[in-house]
């Protein structure tokens, strides 16, 4: 199935690329989420007319992500949680908790943007957490977990 990408898609291509993908990936993900359109003559012509508009929208998204990354780079978030004597938390700190703490400190962050590659945080301490704001923009935030 040949498609024209309407936005940058990770591990596939950039805006305007003509790509060949499996039918299921195209029908079940790219087309329903508006990330691509079928590559036929009519859609190619329509895309070329809208190309400047789509590129401007993509540039605006990236610029806003970069400004949020600059704000996040300056932040250090403290999260309090109940913990035992040895610093082991009763429960854990996950992406949702970190996203809520960042949003409360003034920078809007979605749960899906927070990356914890080693799983949830289960110990008291300081952690560097990656926040994936855009396919090209990633910020690191210092998260301090203290016992309540």
From Swiss-Prot:
Transmembrane parts of this sequence: none
Keywords tagged on the record: Ribonucleoprotein, Ribosomal protein, RNA-binding, rRNA-binding
InterPro entries, per database record: Ribosomal_bL9 (IPR000244), Ribosomal_bL9/RNase_H1_N (IPR009027), Ribosomal_bL9_bac/chp (IPR020594), Ribosomal_bL9_C (IPR020069), Ribosomal_bL9_C_sf (IPR036791), Ribosomal_bL9_N (IPR020070), Ribosomal_bL9_N_sf (IPR036935)
GO MF term (any one): structural constituent of ribosome
Pfam name, any one: Ribosomal_L9_N
Gene3D superfamilies given in the database record: Ribosomal protein L9, C-terminal domain (3.10.430.100), Ribosomal protein L9, N-terminal domain (3.40.5.10)
Any GO BP annotation: translation
GO CC field: ribonucleoprotein complex; ribosome
Keyword match Iron-sulfur: no
NCBIfam families the UniProt entry points to: L9
Functional note: Binds to the 23S rRNA.
PANTHER family linked: 50S RIBOSOMAL PROTEIN L9
Family, similarity comment: Belongs to the bacterial ribosomal protein bL9 family.
Protein name (database record): Large ribosomal subunit protein bL9
Gene source species: Pseudomonas putida (strain ATCC 47054 / DSM 6125 / CFBP 8728 / NCIMB 11950 / KT2440)
Name of the coding gene: rplI
């Amino acid at each position: 199935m040949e498609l024209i990408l309407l936005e940058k898609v990770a591990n596939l291509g950039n805006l305007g690329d003509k790509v060949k993908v499996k039918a299921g990936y195209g029908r079940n993900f790219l087309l329903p989420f508006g990330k691509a359109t079928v590559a036929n003559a009519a859609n190619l012509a329509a895309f070329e007319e809208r190309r400047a508009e789509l590129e401007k929208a993509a540039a605006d998204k990236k610029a806003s992500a970069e400004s949020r990354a600059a704000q996040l780079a300056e932040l250090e978030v403290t999260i309090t949680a109940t913990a035992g004597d040895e610093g082991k938390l009763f429960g854990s700190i996950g992406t949702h908790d970190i996203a809520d703490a960042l949003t409360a400190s003034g920078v809007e962050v979605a749960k899906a943007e927070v990356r914890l590659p080693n799983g949830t945080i289960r110990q008291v301490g300081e952690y560097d957490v990656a926040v994936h704001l855009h396919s090209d923009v990633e910020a690191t935030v210092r998260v301090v977990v203290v016992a309540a």
